């Protein structure tokens, strides 16, 4: 998953890891009881954001921020209960976590009775079927690839707008839905925690404009939505706590305000005056502020640092930068110390040398391009010499934030030392990923980040590096390197067919090394997510699945 710390990902951490991240203090704003007494009712939570969401349409959303917000609006077949010491997979719309059969190629879910939309009508299995079928429509795009990859007939299905249904999704009755898969997927019920595995009533589907008209079956519904300005959520009066094991409905509403400078958001929350006391930021702390705020003792109770086994990286377009020697030279030339400084220093994360993060099944520690995070300029120049001393000009795409632009400056400085001219192209943060995921883009270098959709390498490497998916997803391509290496593709297929977890993880480790041998990406940092809340905001817990502060139990202190 993605996003400016906003892309995907779904990572479960141990309780000890979370406590370390919060400074080993249970008095941090990490739970209702620890943040000032029992949850109260009423009040409005203000959410401050630099940019609008790429999408809220549940079948299109594939960012951490969008997925976090969708948790308030839509319910999924399964979900994560994070009130205990570790996240627990539970039924959400479904009564339980599903039943596999036929070697995990068939999954059956039974829906709860009495789950209501915002107009009081009941959620049904055909609504979920229709919602999942929307994944396949070319009229809407941007979401994760799993439905197309795993559902029988998915490779040829064009979505419900063409007037046809997908036969591999069956609804034998009003409350039962059955998925037929083309391969065994033992963790399919973790896939169904993602927003797209939710109900969309056909009568309220507005197609490409559904982003601003999402029909709610969660505790909050969209009252008004002015893109790039403000999203206002109000209570869904037909939502029932008795049917929802995950969420609460404590505040009266939520106002998301877009378009504020990232550093201005930091300083507003830090000052804790007026409405800032009942506000939380949903944009990461600016790199220029992070070191100071992370080490300010007075902010400890309001500061959230969430380790997220995810990766911040520089993708090299292998179809544009075709010479592997030049790509290898870039690997050695990048100074990760200045790059990390742009993102906020050590508080942002550790230096990365692999695409799989520690904590992800399949991670293997290795470093193909030297131990010095500052790079190896001599080696980089030697590789450029072997490539014939070209003097290429390359474009780099980044979000239009000070943090990202400082990062681009660091890349530009590093590469110009080896004769590469770098042209920086800032892209509006609200449309950044939809722009770079379009295969018509002309960028040589692209900043990206990724968090596993759940803690398995299957949600990282195949999505980011299966070159066979590029043509299938021309407007939602996640392979920013445009890598289509037969060796990598073969390893992806091998891993998918390997039932033994240890052997499968070994294959993913081998795959990670091959991708780095291809010099398709420069891994930069294993990321942390850092954000703050006002002093009157309670009930915030670190969502170690979406890697955002969770709002499902949030309340305003009286």
Sequence positions of predicted segments:
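N-terminal lobe/hinge region of extracytoplasmic solute-binding protein
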Residues: 48-102, 213-215
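Surface-exposed binding/hinge segments that line
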Residues: 110, 127-129, 140-201, 224-226
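Structural transition elements
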Residues: 220, 347-386, 403-406
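Extracellular/periplasmic solute-recognition and catalytic clefts
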Residues: 223-234, 255-318
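Long beta-strand-rich cores associated with HINT superfamily self-processing modules
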Residues: 531-558
């Amino acid at each position: 998953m993605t996003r400016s710390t906003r892309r995907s990902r779904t990572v479960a951490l141990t309780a000890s890891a979370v406590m370390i991240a919060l400074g080993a203090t249970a008095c941090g704003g990490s739970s209702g009881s620890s943040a000032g007494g029992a949850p109260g009712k009423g009040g409005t939570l203000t959410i401050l954001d630099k940019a609008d969401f790429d999408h809220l349409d549940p079948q299109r959303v594939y960012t951490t921020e969008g997925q976090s917000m969708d948790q308030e609006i839509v319910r999924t077949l399964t979900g994560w209960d994070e009130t205990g010491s570790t996240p627990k997979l539970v039924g959400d719309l479904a009564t339980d976590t599903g039943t596999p059969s036929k070697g995990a190629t068939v999954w059956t879910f039974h829906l709860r009775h009495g789950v209501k939309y915002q107009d009081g009508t009941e959620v049904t299995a055909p609504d979920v079927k229709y919602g999942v079928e929307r994944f396949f429509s070319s009229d809407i795009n941007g979401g994760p690839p799993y439905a197309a990859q795993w559902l029988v007939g998915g490779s040829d299905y064009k979505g419900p707008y063409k007037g046809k249904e997908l036969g591999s999704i069956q609804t034998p009755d009003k409350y039962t839905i059955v998925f037929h898969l083309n391969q065994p997927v033992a963790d399919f019920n973790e896939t169904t925690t993602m927003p797209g595995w939710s109900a969309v009533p056909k009568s309220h589907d507005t197609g490409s404009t559904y982003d601003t008209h999402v029909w709610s079956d969660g505790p909050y519904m969209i009252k008004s939505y002015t893109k790039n300005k403000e999203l206002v959520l109000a209570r869904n009066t037909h939502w029932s706590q008795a049917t929802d094991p995950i969420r609460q409905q404590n505040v009266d509403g939520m106002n998301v305000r877009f378009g504020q400078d990232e550093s201005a958001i930091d300083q507003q929350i830090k000052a804790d005056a007026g409405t800032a006391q009942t506000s939380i930021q949903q944009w990461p702390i600016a790199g220029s502020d992070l070191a100071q705020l992370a080490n300010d003792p007075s902010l400890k109770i309001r500061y959230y640092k969430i380790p997220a086994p995810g990766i911040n990286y520089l993708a090299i377009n292998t179809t544009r930068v075709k010479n592997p020697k030049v790509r290898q030279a870039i690997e050695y030339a990048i100074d990760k110390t200045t790059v990390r400084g742009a993102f906020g220093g050590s508080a942002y994360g550790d230096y990365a040398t692999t695409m799989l993060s520690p904590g992800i099944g399949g991670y293997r520690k290795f470093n193909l391009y030297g131990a010095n995070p500052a790079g190896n300029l001599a080696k980089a120049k030697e590789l450029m010499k072997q490539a014939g001393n070209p003097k290429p000009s390359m474009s780099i795409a980044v979000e239009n934030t000070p943090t990202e632009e400082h990062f681009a400056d660091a890349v530009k400085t590093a590469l110009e030392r080896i004769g590469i001219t770098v042209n920086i192209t800032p892209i509006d943060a609200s449309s950044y990923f939809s722009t770079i995921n379009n295969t018509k883009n002309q960028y040589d270098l692209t900043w990206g980040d990724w968090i596993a959709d759940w803690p398995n390498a299957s949600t990282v490497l195949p999505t980011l590096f299966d070159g066979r998916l590029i043509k299938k997803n021309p407007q939602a391509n996640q392979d920013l390197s445009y890598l289509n290496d037969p060796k990598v593709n073969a390893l992806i297929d091998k891993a998918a067919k390997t039932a033994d977890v240890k052997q499968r993880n070994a294959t993913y480790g081998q795959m990670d090394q091959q991708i780095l041998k291809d010099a398709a990406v420069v891994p930069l940092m294993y990321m942390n997510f850092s954000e703050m809340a006002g002093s009157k905001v309670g009930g915030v817990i670190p969502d170690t699945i979406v890697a955002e502060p969770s709002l499902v139990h949030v309340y305003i202190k009286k």
